[in-house]
Regions:
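N-terminal, post-signal-peptide segments of secreted/periplasmic proteins
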Residues: 21-118, 124-127, 132, 137, ...
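The feature encodes a structural signal of leucine-rich repeats
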Residues: 119, 145, 175-176, 273
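Ser/Thr/Gly/Pro-rich low-complexity, disordered linker/stalk segments of secreted
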Residues: 445-463
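Predominantly extracellular beta-rich ligand-binding scaffolds that present long acidic/polar faces
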Residues: 126-133, 150-153, 158-168, 174, ...
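Intrinsic disorder/low-complexity segments, especially N-terminal tails and targeting/processing regions
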Residues: 19-21, 291, 311, 438
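Sec-dependent, cleavable N-terminal signal peptides
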Residues: 1-24, 462
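Alpha-helical and His/Cys-centered functional microenvironments
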Residues: 11, 173, 446-450
Length: 464
């Protein structure tokens, strides 16, 4: 009898544990900032592993401060075009608490303000956060990470951004769109895939060689990968009046950065690197860096360095075109290695510095005397088209018929990569030999999804 009773109690306890471990779904039923049915109340009530979904549309306007996520939860929105959470420029939107694992999908986060702190839209506070199909926009602060601050300093933090847009955010110091922080021996990982980082800015005062870095993204000692994405129309620094500032309008990297199948375009700074400023480890493959500029002035003299890239870089199967600097190289100012890459019409010069040629490059000028490897072509027009939709998720420069880049790449190349910048179905080797640059000339596959169109933004509210 005692054994039977003991067994029965054990079964009941087991069932209770199983029931407790089962995830619950809590549905947000109104757009109030607090009270029953609100998102804030749902986040108060959840347990680890629960799901928060929504039966509402419109805007949740925050009036009681940031939304704290202090459980490991899934927040599943109805779509970024359907529901927004607005900080009203009075508070941050989301704060993901330390040690938690969270995911947010299908929401727009807007109007976040961190004040003098970091992360206007989101603070990922030593947590693991995945964002999918979201928009983070019109947020900022006087510190770091206007849109998102991924804090792994003296600890760890991991941020994954998928199929999302980070746009029109501002930070006074660095990381207008995103700041990835691995300072003080920390570990911060940032992964961006199939996403757009555009129209963000970082600006500070006119301190010589300081202030306003990483208009789009700033990576401070962390591990960062960007794949199938666009970083465009970001800005960094100020023109003066005493001394221009700013570095890495698109990206400023002080860690390890790998860029693959992506486009860095039309970013502008006033001192170092319109496109990418590197003071760490930088690898760019199957990508396009185009139309970026560094245009500072000092005492009436040009002062912009490296329109496309400044620093050490390993650059392969890529295209650098039409970048501008008013003082030094429009393309690359720095060192590293370059192979199977097009350098076209970067004003000033395509390269300033000492680069090791891996061979099979084409330069519209003499390449600064660096391109002496096998198959290198200098003072040669690569014959490329404008930056446009040529298929795939990002904009590219197509090779025109008759281009000297066609079938002129490394004859010993074998995949991977299996596809050019546009990804499947655009193979990396067509007609027996790889082309030079990020684009492989081949018939257009009309079924390939076009680059995501940017929704027409609403008028930008005046910050309070």
């Amino acid at each position: 009898m005692r054994r039977t009773t003991t067994n029965a109690i054990g079964v009941l306890l087991f069932c209770a544990v199983v029931i407790q471990l089962q995830a619950s779904t809590i549905t947000v039923t109104n757009t109030n900032d607090s009270g029953p049915g609100s998102l804030r109340q749902a986040l108060t009530n959840v347990n680890d592993g629960d799901v928060v979904n929504f039966a509402v549309s419109g805007t949740i306007a925050l009036t009681n401060g940031e939304l704290l996520v202090d459980k490991s939860v899934t927040i599943s929105g109805p779509g970024a075009a359907t529901l927004a959470v607005d900080g009203n420029f009075t508070s941050r939107v989301f704060h993901i608490g330390p040690g938690k694992t969270a995911s947010i999908s299908g929401l727009t986060l807007t109007g976040g303000s961190a004040g003098s702190e970091n992360g206007g839209g989101i603070l990922n506070d030593h947590a693991i956060l995945t964002m999918d199909s979201c928009a983070v926009r019109n947020s900022g602060g006087f510190g770091l990470g206007g849109g998102i601050y991924n804090d792994g300093s003296a600890g760890s933090g991991a941020l994954t951004i998928l199929n999302s847009t980070v746009s029109r955010n501002r930070a006074s110091y660095a990381g207008g769109g995103i700041y990835n922080d691995a300072d003080n021996g920390g570990n911060a990982t940032l992964t961006i895939m199939n996403s757009t980082v555009d129209g963000n800015g970082a600006a500070y005062n006119d301190i010589p060689f300081g202030g306003g870095e990483g208009g789009g993204i700033y990576n401070s000692g962390g591990m960062m990968t960007i794949t199938n994405s666009s970083v465009s129309d970001n800005s960094a620094g100020l023109p003066g009046p005493n001394f221009p500032t700013g570095a890495g309008a698109g990206i400023s990297n002080y860690g390890t950065l790998t860029i693959t199948n992506s486009t860095i375009s039309s970013n502008n700074c006033f001192l170092f690197a319109g496109g990418v400023y590197n003071n760490g480890t930088l690898t760019i493959t199957n990508s396009t860096v185009t139309g970026n500029s560094a245009v500072g002035q000092h005492d009436g003299h040009p002062w912009g360095h490296g329109g496309g890239i400044v620093g050490e870089v390993t650059l392969t199967n890529s295209t650098l075109s039409n970048n501008y600097s008013n003082l030094s190289a429009g393309g690359i100012e720095g060192s590293g290695a370059i192979g199977n890459t097009i350098l076209n019409s970067n004003s000033g010069a395509n390269i300033t510095g000492s680069m090791t040629s891996l061979g099979y490059n084409i330069s519209s000028d003499d390449g600064g005397g660096n391109l002496t490897g096998p198959g290198d072509q200098i003072n040669t027009d690569p014959m490329i088209g404008p930056l446009q939709n040529n298929g795939g998720p990002t904009l590219t420069h197509a090779l025109l018929p008759g281009s000297p880049a066609v079938n002129a790449g490394d004859p010993n190349f074998t995949p991977p990569p299996f596809y050019d910048q546009r990804e499947t179905p655009y193979v990396r080797v067509f007609n027996g030999r790889i082309d030079i640059g990020a684009f492989e000339l081949q018939p257009r596959h009309h079924a390939t999804p076009a680059p995501r169109s940017r929704p027409t933004p609403p008028p930008r509210p005046t910050p309070r």
